[in-house]
Regions:
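Bacterial N-terminal signal peptides that target proteins for export
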Residues: 1-9
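N-terminal signal peptide c-region/cleavage motif recognized by signal peptidases
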Residues: 14-17
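Signal-peptide-cleaved, periplasmic/extracellular N-terminal interaction regions immediately downstream
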Residues: 20-159, 421, 430-433, 461, ...
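Active-site-adjacent mobile loop/cap segments within catalytic or ligand-binding domains
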Residues: 52, 63, 126, 240, ...
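Intrinsically disordered, low-complexity mixed-charge segments
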Residues: 133, 377-413
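Catalytic-core regions of hydrolytic enzymes
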Residues: 135-285, 296-300, 304-308, 364, ...
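Extracellular LysM carbohydrate-binding repeats and other cell-envelope/extracellular binding modules
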Residues: 418-421, 430-433, 437-468
Length: 468
């Protein structure tokens, strides 16, 4: 009897561990197509080990998952608009699930796993990057600093428009109509893109223009790579209950949030990478340098002023949830040099506001309000650009063309040292009207909390705040 047990024990040791363990179920497969890559996401019942390899003639990518079993077939997967021509699956005798992707073109594959987050459990993510695009894209070369005593003639002001969430990350879901935040933000972003494109002196850049996910750090990199001077991230808020309503504007804070509610919102938005799918190995490698750079510049202050202009414009189409620009540690706003704001357009958790967010006319109204705020801030942003590059007034031999709108804005005084001395009987609102600026902007620039003004107080006034 002892010999029998010994034989069974030794036989058990010879069996691979992945055969003894309960197989991990691969129970769903989704595909997202971005401009430069195809993303495949496998839903898993638990964690697993996997291997990734490529084969040529014809081009294929092979994914091997140890101790896995395909629960559902692959026939329903639509690959017609992706880099993949067909998907095949086979289960090997050792318990390994082999997925073969037949390709339309050469790709550079990359894989990573995601732990449970939001509505998702364990996931395996496969990104297929276009090999042709990757080879054609040269490595970025450092820009030479402008020679001393040279004036840099400005071009159009580049506005980066970021539609929040996307792809795997639907964002908040409306209660009544099941509206997805990612769809609403993309619709508003596209409306804003058209309006900015039609505005003299401005040029729009879309961070995402389809139903795919872009990592939070990648959004910043894309804005910077396109020389953006404004970054606007569009969202639709959600909270428990149905009563919360109104728009809000947020800027970055390095020292905590404006309130506990704002901190919770920032935590929720920052979790987008966990839900949408970003390789954590690529995130935050430059965080320390970024924060140091931001402290050395006035980017956060510029963001607050920009936010106040946009917030005041949003007041014209509905109520405000916060009457002042709020601050928290939003990852997507951590650009070292680009004034950046996050606009929560409305509460998708409020049935009435959810209905409005689905309406194209309302989407356009929101976009128009954001544009109005951007136009109000435009002269100061042009002045900010000049302050960064202007070293001496010496004409360049062949200046670049400048749009009429920017010529007008550039002609305005660039000094921000103007002061207003408060006279008896003057109020904040009266002074704001005098200089064609918003009260909130005046409050922020001068650190004013209430409405009381001391006679003789010196208030800082922006160089120019009028509408274009």
């Amino acid at each position: 009897m002892t010999r029998v047990w010994r034989f069974l024990f030794l036989a058990a040791l010879a069996i691979p561990v992945n055969v003894l363990a309960a197989p991990v179920s691969v129970h769903n497969l989704r595909l997202w197509q971005a401009p430069d890559n195809t993303r495949l996401v496998f839903d898993l019942s638990g964690p697993l080990e996997h291997r990734l390899s490529t084969l040529n003639d014809p081009e294929r990518v092979v994914i091997e998952m140890e101790g896995a079993r395909l629960k559902d077939g692959l026939a329903s997967l639509d690959v017609s608009h992706s880099y993949i021509s067909a998907v095949r699956a086979a289960e090997k005798s050792d318990g390994t699930l082999r997925i073969t992707l037949e390709l339309r073109r050469p790709v550079r594959p990359k894989s990573f796993v995601l732990r449970p987050a939001g509505q998702y459990g364990h996931r395996l993510v496969i990104d297929l990057y276009d090999e042709v695009i990757a080879r054609a894209s040269p490595s970025p070369t450092p820009r030479a600093a402008p020679p001393a005593r040279q004036v840099m003639a400005p071009n159009d002001l580049v506005v980066a428009i970021d539609a929040g969430h996307g792809g795997e990350d639907p964002g908040a879901i409306g209660r009544r109509y099941r509206t997805r935040e990612k769809d609403v933000t993309l619709a508003i972003a596209r409306e804003l893109y058209k309006l900015v494109a039609a505005t003299p002196g401005m040029k729009p850049v879309m961070i995402r223009d389809g139903d795919y996910y872009v990592g939070l750090r990648k959004r910043i990199e894309k804005a910077s790579g396109n020389d953006a001077e404004i970054f606007v991230s569009i969202h639709a808020d959600a909270v428990p209950g149905r009563q919360a309503h109104g728009s809000s504007v947020y800027a970055l804070s390095l020292r905590g949030a404006s309130s506990e509610q704002v901190r919770v919102l920032a935590d929720k938005e920052n979790a987008a990478d966990l839900i949408g799918g970003a390789d954590i190995g690529e995130v935050d490698s430059m965080t320390h340098k970024v924060l140091v750079d931001m402290i050395q510049t006035a980017t956060i202050g510029d963001s607050m002023v920009l936010g106040a202009d946009v917030l005041a414009s949003l007041r014209g189409i509905g109520s405000l949830h916060h009457v002042k620009v709020q601050q928290a540690g939003f990852m997507v706003l951590k650009s070292p040099k680009i004034p950046s704001i996050l606009v929560e357009t409305a509460f998708i958790s409020n049935p009435d506001e959810e209905r409005k967010l689905r309406d194209r006319n309302y989407q356009r109204s929101i976009a128009e309000s954001i544009l109005k705020g951007l136009k109000r801030a435009m002269p100061r942003l042009i002045a900010r650009r000049g302050g960064e590059t202007l070293q001496a007034v010496v004409p360049t031999p062949t200046p670049s063309p400048v749009s009429p709108a920017l010529q007008s804005a550039q002609a305005a005084p660039v000094s921000t040292a103007r002061e207003h001395i408060v006279k008896p009987g003057e109020t904040l609102s009266a002074i704001a009207r005098l200089y064609d600026m918003h009260v909130e902007t005046l409050r922020f620039l001068n650190g004013i909390q209430g409405n009381d003004l001391a006679v003789g107080a010196r208030l800082q006034i922006p160089a120019r705040s009028s509408e274009l």
